[in-house]
């Protein structure tokens, strides 16, 4: 062990390293001095014991990695979305035929939701499901309203907010119908359900978690 640590450089090794060759005693003295400076708190006996058994780690430290805080992407506010007109339907896209596939998807969605619409299916069950269902793609009609000009309007529901329905009619006209003071009908495979807009002033996401109470009569 000692001969390995204090091995003198050969002439070739000295030439390759561009250093002057030194004797074994000078090499030993250099190593001891270096170890003493590197391990000042270690006693000579402990240092000697370490040399006999294993290598001495002259310098060791761990680098603490800084935890980078993940920045959450900040979404646009409702006001910013309105200003950017993100939800506006472009005039060239306001075509009834363009949204017929959406209506077909909606009908299949309702069939799956109601476990198949059969002639003996209870209307109350369908009504309860529709109250919490996503209505985008449904064909809805205004049957009653305090504003006579709304009555009779029928189309595919494209957008729903807390207070309005936006529907596209067969005449390719986009209509904005307020929920307040209006009664709507939704037809699904022969089943007709009524929606009282005044009691339906919720966002679709909020409606799915709301418990609706059955009432005998509801005024506009």
UniProtKB/Swiss-Prot annotation:
Compartments in which it is found: Nucleus, Nucleolus
Record GO cellular component, one term: ribonuclease P complex
GO process annotations (BP): rRNA processing; tRNA 5'-leader removal
This protein's record includes keyword DNA repair: no
Subunit description: Component of nuclear RNase P and RNase MRP ribonucleoproteins. RNase P consists of a catalytic RNA moiety and 10 different protein chains; POP1, POP4, POP5, POP7, RPP14, RPP21, RPP25, RPP30, RPP38 and RPP40. Within the RNase P complex, POP1, POP7 and RPP25 form the 'finger' subcomplex, POP5, RPP14, RPP40 and homodimeric RPP30 form the 'palm' subcomplex, and RPP21, POP4 and RPP38 form the 'wrist' subcomplex. All subunits of the RNase P complex interact with the catalytic RNA. Several subunits of RNase P are also part of the RNase MRP complex.
Protein name per UniProt: Ribonuclease P protein subunit p29
Highest taxon, organism lineage: Eukaryota
Phosphoserine modified-residue sites: 10
Upper classification of the organism: Eukaryota, Metazoa, Chordata, Craniata, Vertebrata
GO MF term set: ribonuclease P activity; ribonuclease P RNA binding
InterPro entries xref list: RNase_P/MRP_Rpp29-subunit, RNase_P/MRP_Rpp29_sf, Rof/RNase_P-like, Rpp29/RNP1
Function description: Component of ribonuclease P, a ribonucleoprotein complex that generates mature tRNA molecules by cleaving their 5'-ends.
Keywords from the UniProt entry: Nucleus, Phosphoprotein, RNA-binding, tRNA processing
Keyword Glycosyltransferase in annotation: no
One Pfam assignment: RNase_P-MRP_p29
Record-stated family: Belongs to the eukaryotic/archaeal RNase P protein component 1 family.
């Amino acid at each position: 062990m000692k001969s390995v640590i204090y091995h003198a450089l050969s002439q070739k090794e000295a030439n390759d390293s561009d250093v002057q060759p030194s004797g074994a005693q000078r090499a030993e003295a250099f190593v001891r001095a270096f170890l003493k400076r590197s391990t000042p708190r270690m006693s000579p006996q402990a240092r000697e014991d370490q040399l006999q058994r294993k290598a001495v780690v002259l310098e060791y430290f761990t680098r603490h990695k800084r935890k980078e805080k993940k920045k959450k992407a900040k979404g646009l506010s409702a006001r910013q979305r309105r200003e950017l007109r993100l939800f506006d339907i472009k005039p060239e896209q306001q075509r009834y035929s363009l949204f017929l596939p959406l209506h077909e998807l909606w009908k299949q969605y309702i069939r799956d939701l109601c476990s198949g619409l059969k002639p003996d299916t209870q209307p109350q069950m369908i009504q309860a499901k529709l109250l919490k269902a996503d209505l985008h793609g449904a064909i809805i009609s205004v049957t009653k309203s305090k504003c006579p000009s709304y009555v009779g309007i029928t189309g595919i529901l494209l957008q729903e907010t807390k207070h309005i329905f936006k529907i596209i009619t067969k005449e390719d006209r986009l209509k904005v119908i307020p929920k307040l003071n209006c009664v709507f009908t939704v037809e699904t495979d022969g089943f007709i359900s009524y929606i009282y807009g005044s009691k339906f002033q919720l966002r679709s996401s909020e409606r799915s978690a709301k418990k609706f109470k059955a009432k005998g009569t509801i005024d506009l």
